[in-house]
């Protein structure tokens, strides 16, 4: 359930994220919560003309800069060994960004182990697997 919760001054986006944080804490595992942003694709300007709808001006040519495509995982190991993305319910953008994120990480010398728990049981399994790393 995506109900925001505050714990120790940290605002978690869901109950499952809070559960994950507390279980990592209980296990003595250090984790950074939403602290590392990855740029999956740099922003740019399209060099040719693009016609797009505008709120008040109708269908017009635009030169709007395309912003960076970024990804901020939920939990990151400070030593770079693992990343946890807690996802109870995926939104429509998540599957594409997750694929882009995995592709980005594969370009690194030593990509981390990725975990995508979707419920409390999988969070507990994730923590046991992290202990073995």
Question: Over which residues does each language-model region extend?
Answer:
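Electrostatic, structured charged patches in enzyme active sites and in nucleic-acid/phosphate-binding
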Residues: 1-133
